[in-house]
């Protein structure tokens, strides 16, 4: 999931001739949902949007307060073009989640924002509509966010599984098991360590 977050003095969304949403001071969030996004990506973005410290405090100290600290507004606008991949000069949007899946996913994120913050301070555009978005950037301050990708490389997944198995195996071993393994490794490195000891024993048995 990708987001372009802008600190604004005001922002609004117009569809046709009707202004359907507007905010004063706060954040305008353009949100691009990927076909690979899950609830973990929603949780990450909600947490970051609401806690990002891009506002000054009462003493004028910059980068000190979040939108929640100042009880400011948030305007979210669905923006599938953030998932663009260029093929030459032509944008390709196959990485974006299809609209029929993205709309409930987006609505779920809005609901989570409202549950975490004050619902009356979370505004949005109109999903799938052709919108005119007016953004009066304050600063300007523009921050690009991207949720951490889940590991999809089979080699990376296999490596992580092996590392986890080694950790579990180490935890389950007793001290004696570990000591025996170390002794076995030493004997492989220095074969004379074991053969010499056996020779001493046999020589004691000879008359």
Swiss-Prot record:
Protein name: D-aminoacyl-tRNA deacylase 1
Entry's free-text remark on domains: A Gly-cisPro motif from one monomer fits into the active site of the other monomer to allow specific chiral rejection of L-amino acids.
Record flagged with keyword Cytoplasm: yes
Enzyme's top EC category: hydrolase
Cross-referenced InterPro entries: Daa-tRNA_deacyls_DTD, DTD-like_sf
Species annotation: Danio rerio (Zebrafish)
Catalytic function, reaction form: a D-aminoacyl-tRNA + H2O = a tRNA + a D-alpha-amino acid + H(+); glycyl-tRNA(Ala) + H2O = tRNA(Ala) + glycine + H(+)
Basic and acidic residues bias locations: 156-167, 178-189
Subcellular location as annotated: Cytoplasm
EC number: 3.1.1.96
Region: Disordered, residue numbers: 142-207
Quaternary state and interactors: Homodimer.
Job description of the protein: D-aminoacyl-tRNA deacylase, with no observable activity on tRNAs charged with their cognate L-amino acid. Hydrolyzes correctly charged, achiral, glycyl-tRNA(Gly). Deacylates mischarged D.melanogaster and E.coli glycyl-tRNA(Ala), protecting cells against glycine mischarging by AlaRS. Acts via tRNA-based rather than protein-based catalysis; rejects L-amino acids rather than detecting D-amino acids in the active site.
Residues spanned by motif Gly-cisPro motif, important for rejection of L-amino acids: 139-140
Any GO CC annotation of this UniProt entry: cytoplasm
One GO term (biological process): tRNA metabolic process
Principal place of residence: cytoplasm
Keyword Hydrolase: yes
Keywords, alphabetical: Cytoplasm, Hydrolase, RNA-binding, tRNA-binding
A molecular function GO annotation: tRNA binding
Gene3D superfamilies named among the record's database cross-references: D-tyrosyl-tRNA(Tyr) deacylase
Family: Belongs to the DTD family.
């Amino acid at each position: 999931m990708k987001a372009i977050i802008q600190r604004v003095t005001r922002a609004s969304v117009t569809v046709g001739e009707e202004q359907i949403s507007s905010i004063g001071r706060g954040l305008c969030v353009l949100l691009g949902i990927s076909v690979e996004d899950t609830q973990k990506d929603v949780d990450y973005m909600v947490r970051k949007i609401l806690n990002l410290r891009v506002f000054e405090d009462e003493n004028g100290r910059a980068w000190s307060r979040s939108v929640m600290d100042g009880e400011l507004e948030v305007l979210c606008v669905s923006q599938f073009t953030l998932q663009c991949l260029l093929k030459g000069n032509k944008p390709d949007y196959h990485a974006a989640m299809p609209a029929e899946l993205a709309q409930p996913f987006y609505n779920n994120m809005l609901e989570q924002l409202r549950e975490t913050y004050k619902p009356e301070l979370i505004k949005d555009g109109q999903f799938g509509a052709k919108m005119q978005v007016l953004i009066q950037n304050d600063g300007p301050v523009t921050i690009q966010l991207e949720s951490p990708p889940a590991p999809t490389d089979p080699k990376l997944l296999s490596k992580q599984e092996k590392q986890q198995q080694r950790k579990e195996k180490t935890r389950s071993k007793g001290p004696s098991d570990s000591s025996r393994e170390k002794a076995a490794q030493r004997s492989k490195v220095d074969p004379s360590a074991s053969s010499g000891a056996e020779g001493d024993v046999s020589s004691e048995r000879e008359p």
